[in-house]
């Protein structure tokens, strides 16, 4: 079987992490099929095949673009594939052969994002209509849609009532092995980014549903009510959303207390970006990990922190309850007072903190990219045979 993988996202934020890990582990579990891995110019050199059956194909077409539906489509057709795997929803809509997708969430369907957009409202609404049309077509055209949680599967079944449950396959994500490596340059990293005190950490994008505003408000309560003297460190990609958050932090007079760091993405024009190794160092030195999102599909970053002994406090939402069970402290993401109280409990109670560190290590063991790859490979085989 000849399989194509759309890896143009390779290594970039959430979808890129997923793509990177699924490819690396498919290389380990599949020694018989041949793969064409489509990459952009920015990440072409980042991927180095470790399985002779995996070959790289340059497909320098921007995602969510017109070229994705024209030039990229031609590139894929030239490979004469038996199956095309897209670890997202943005398929070439005119691709005529079998497709398997992996779609991480349905946030644009289940959470109103108008408030958070940086675009003119009329333009945003046009993009939203186009997004939903392509999304629906991707589900329709997919032999199977791989989803990362039961929560996301339930949302698919609710919004696409014309499709049977058999359309979807559950495959939990895992912890990137690169994020469990030990690093020894903690002091150097802290000094580089101006982290002069103890700190609370959060890693992820700054879209409206991530509720980063709520995190900053929580920090203000923690500082004023509980006398917290540490810093809040937010690591995100550099984009319009993080730039807007930086302005809000400055407006509140918190620029010395709330630090915004940008992690590395290929299109970043910044000279100062946080590398993967530095994120490991930050996680190993932080006091507590906090995520206040209103919506998530799997929420991997807290798990990555727990893998190196960082206890987590998370928003009490369905996805988090499913993935993390009793291994984290939960709070109402709409209640900044409660958020601060729960975070402070971990900060001041070493025994409680140690309890959740141990629970975290145990919970991490449940998730493995090798399992994800094996499930995905079985989906490929089923699609090819039917």
Spans of features found by a protein language model:
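Carbohydrate transferase catalytic cores enriched for Leloir-type hexosyltransferases
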Residues: 1-386
């Amino acid at each position: 079987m000849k399989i194509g993988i759309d890896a143009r996202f390779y290594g970039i934020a959430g979808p890129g992490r997923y793509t990177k890990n699924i490819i690396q582990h498919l290389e380990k579990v599949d020694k018989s099929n041949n793969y064409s891995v489509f990459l952009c110019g920015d990440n072409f050199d980042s991927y180095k095949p470790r399985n002779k059956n995996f070959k790289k194909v340059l497909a320098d077409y921007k995602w969510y673009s017109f070229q994705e539906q024209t030039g990229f489509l031609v590139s894929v057709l030239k490979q004469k594939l038996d199956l095309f795997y897209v670890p997202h929803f943005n398929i070439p809509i005119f691709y005529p052969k079998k497709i398997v997708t992996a779609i991480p969430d349905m946030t644009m369907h289940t959470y109103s994002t108008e408030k958070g957009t940086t675009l003119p409202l009329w333009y945003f609404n046009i993009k939203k209509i186009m997004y939903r049309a392509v999304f629906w077509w991707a589900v329709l055209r997919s032999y199977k849609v791989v989803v990362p949680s039961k929560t996301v599967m339930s949302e698919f079944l609710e919004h696409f009532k014309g499709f049977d449950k058999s359309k979807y396959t559950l495959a939990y994500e895992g912890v990137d092995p690169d994020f469990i490596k030990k690093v020894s340059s903690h002091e150097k990293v802290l000094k580089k980014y101006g982290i002069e005190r103890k700190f609370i950490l959060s890693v992820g994008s700054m879209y409206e549903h991530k509720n980063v505003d709520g995190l900053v408000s929580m920090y203000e309560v923690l500082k004023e009510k509980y006398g917290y003297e540490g810093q809040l460190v937010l690591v995100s990609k550099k984009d319009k959303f993080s730039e807007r958050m930086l302005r809000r932090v400055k407006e509140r007079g918190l620029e010395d207390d709330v630090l915004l760091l940008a992690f590395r993405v290929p299109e970043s024009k910044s000279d100062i970006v946080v590398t993967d190794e530095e994120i490991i160092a930050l996680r190993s030195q932080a006091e507590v990990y906090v995520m206040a999102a209103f919506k998530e599909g799997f929420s991997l970053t807290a798990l990555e922190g727990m893998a190196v002994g960082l206890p987590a406090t998370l928003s009490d939402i369905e996805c988090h309850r499913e993935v993390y069970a009793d291994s984290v402290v939960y709070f109402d993401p709409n209640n900044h007072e409660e958020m601060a109280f729960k975070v402070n409990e971990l900060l001041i109670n070493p025994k409680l903190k140690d309890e959740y560190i141990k629970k975290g290590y145990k919970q991490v063991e449940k998730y493995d990219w090798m399992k994800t790859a094996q499930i995905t490979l079985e989906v490929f085989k089923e699609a090819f045979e039917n």
